[in-house]
């Protein structure tokens, strides 16, 4: 969002809400009558009516339309989607009312519905770690301008302290600020890409502009401090009072004396948003220009909005004298102490991998949940921790081997001056990548440098010989879990016990011993699977280690001896895969069942007609007083239900010879088919609905009655033949 766009938008907005001349005159009268002790404040209903009229004249829809849209969008959605929509629409309403209140110089009071939604959003943010991504671009626009805390005049705030609803807008501002700051922090940690809003679609759901949110805290601080410094210099801390002191070009940063304060400063002067952009004096112009460029370099191009208005405030905030000159009696008032205590007393627990530390701005160190884990016994420890322990024991061995390799590389590099040192493989102070590259550069134990391989796939193949040299006592067959039992009694396995430095510890559990065995043999800890899937392999692995570690004989077979039996009983009736040796006996059970069924006596095959069949009813024929012959369409039977529209037209052409085109046109328009023939014969009111000529209708009804009676007679004869067949079968079944 560029500065030109911002100034145009503000000028258009101010042109819409510019009060009439009568209102301007009243405001001038109010400004003359207003003093520091008495403030003329409009009624709440007057403010809301004025805002409603401004909403109707502005490009944004009314608040009622917003809530109607909210109810429509939240219909049938999950709670998280409802929360996103509520925050987005409430932020739109909040920013819209804020804009109208600032432009019309009126008191801004958000409605209770907006306060309720913002409270809900804050609680959701703190309790459920929800990031409200859809935030209004209008709200970001006013946050970036640095005018967020300059809504109310200082004297009006002092007069409204007795009102219980006086601090409500300030609370809402701080809640919105805290919500957006929390969302910005979580989005920065998640490295979310900032998406900038171009203003084309009003209903577009936007992620938070990270570039704008990084400057949120700084811009709010500018507005607060600029209002205080303007008050010390004699300017009013209103909309333009925050920048009035900088516009005067005062060379000193100290507060002005009381005698120099001008109490007759006009209050209700017409608002000109673009006026503070140009400095009043030539001395202030370079400073403002420099500050504008500094902010433009920090903020993204899309979020650097209205930098000319913020320049004066940033210039005043560069020195710390204003902060140092503030008396110690002015302390920041604590807001929502009861809510803060309630949140501090809650124990939310670590969520999403223990992200409680991100709530450091809410809980002190004394109230946080201790992050130290409880000591786990070996029995309650999950099997997934074995690879972690094995990996931890691998690290010192790998680092020692890497250091030895680096020493050899240094000696070789000093001896051979013709070979240059590779910058990528230099010593990195424990860098494992450099040590692994060093292993690739040396071929065997000769110490000669070779070119490093670019394929990372060959890296595990070169690590295996290095581990085998460090522990030559362990046989290579130990890496495979199907070693024969004869290897357990071989003499080279005996001296393998002193090779492990941690084997002398009497407190080592069988799980620790197995982890050390994995680290010596070189088998990756990730290849270990639960014992239910590898029962036979675990038992075969325990056999060769019987001579070295007697504890494994007591633990591993005892654990893995019982589970295979119920699994085999459950899987025996099922068809196993083709690779299992138990497939032939399972397939033999199928012919046995077939033999038993064949040897059993054949059941009596009964006809589906278990009761005596009923003869068909006599057909109901339509009385025809005229003698007529049966006329059918070409290649069709008397089954008129199977006639299509063309068959019916052909049948009519056989009956009627003169002026048949008019009747056929009516039939095509009304979409006649074979089913229509029954309606024409049986329904006497058919001609009232379809205007067919009477002569044609009479002839079609006579010959149609003949077709209908013939079809019913044939159907009855077919049903009668079927009845006789079923009756004969039933009688044979009863014998």
From Swiss-Prot:
Residues 1-15, 520-534 have a biased composition (Polar residues). Sumoylated by ubc-9. Sumoylation is required for the transcriptional regulation of homeotic genes. Residues 1-59, 223-288, 300-534 are annotated as: Disordered. Residues 239-288, 471-504 have a biased composition (Low complexity). This is Polycomb protein sop-2. The lineage of its organism: Eukaryota, Metazoa, Ecdysozoa, Nematoda, Chromadorea. The RNA-binding region is essential for the localization to subnuclear bodies and its function. The SAM-like domain, although only slightly related to the SAM domain, apparently displays a similar function. It is essential for homodimerization, the interaction with ubc-9, and the formation of subnuclear bodies. It comes from the Eukaryota. Residues 399-413 have a biased composition (Acidic residues). One of its GO terms (molecular function) is ubiquitin protein ligase binding. Residues 621-712 are annotated as: SAM-like. The keyword Transcription applies. Polycomb group (PcG) protein. PcG proteins act by forming multiprotein complexes, which are required to maintain the transcriptionally repressive state of homeotic genes throughout development. PcG proteins are not required to initiate repression, but to maintain it during later stages of development. Also required to repress expression of other genes and for localization of sor-1. Binds RNA. Residues 317-355, 389-398, 450-470 have a biased composition (Basic and acidic residues). Keywords: Chromatin regulator, Nucleus, Repressor, RNA-binding, Transcription, Transcription regulation, Ubl conjugation. Residues 224-503 are annotated as: RNA-binding. One of its GO terms (cellular component) is nuclear speck. Widely expressed. Weakly expressed in most somatic cells of 50-cell stage embryos. At 200 cell stage, it is strongly expressed. By comma stage, it is expressed in most somatic cells. It is found in: Nucleus. It comes from Caenorhabditis elegans. GO terms for biological process: anterior/posterior pattern specification; axon guidance; epigenetic regulation of gene expression; negative regulation of cytoplasmic mRNA processing body assembly; negative regulation of DNA-templated transcription; negative regulation of multicellular organism growth; nematode larval development; neuron fate specification. Homodimer. Interacts with ubc-9. Binds through its N-terminal region to the N-terminal region of sor-1. Its main location: nucleus.
